[in-house]
Amino acid sequence: MDWFPLFNSLRIAAISTVVIFFSGIFAAYYIAKLPPILKGVLDVVLTLPLVLPPTVVGYLLLRLLGPTRPLGAFILEAFETKLVMTWWSAIFATVVVAFPLMYRTARGAFESFDRDLADAGRTLGLSNTWIFWRVRMPCCRQGILAGAVLAFARALGEYGATS
């Protein structure tokens, strides 16, 4: 029995989940603090891959990153490699389709965070960075981990956009 396909799927899903984890936390944290109108627009844009069929997402990525397209030509010129039909394109496609799950879950966790805890930290003289890592992240840990698990499962099961 050949185990390479399973290993390859796990490898792509793991790398994609690491990228999604940090970018999803970053996007969710900063978008949760924006005004409602801007938050709504960005929310629609970032969660669009959830409602599009995977083959449509794959087609759009091919059209965007193909070597004859401006972005694909830039990547070809700058890095002397094409991105389409490579191992990296599978990672990029899984990041695109699984990112909304991490983003929405983490954003929900950040929006449900009790701001009085952050205010209490500020009154004690803590910096925003310290409050983020020592107060906000531990309080939002369950939502963030749930988003990471959902993103990993989506990345592991992704076939449409990567085929």
Segments predicted by a language model, with ranges:
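Membrane-water interface segments at the C-terminal ends of transmembrane alpha-helices
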Residues: 1-111, 135-163
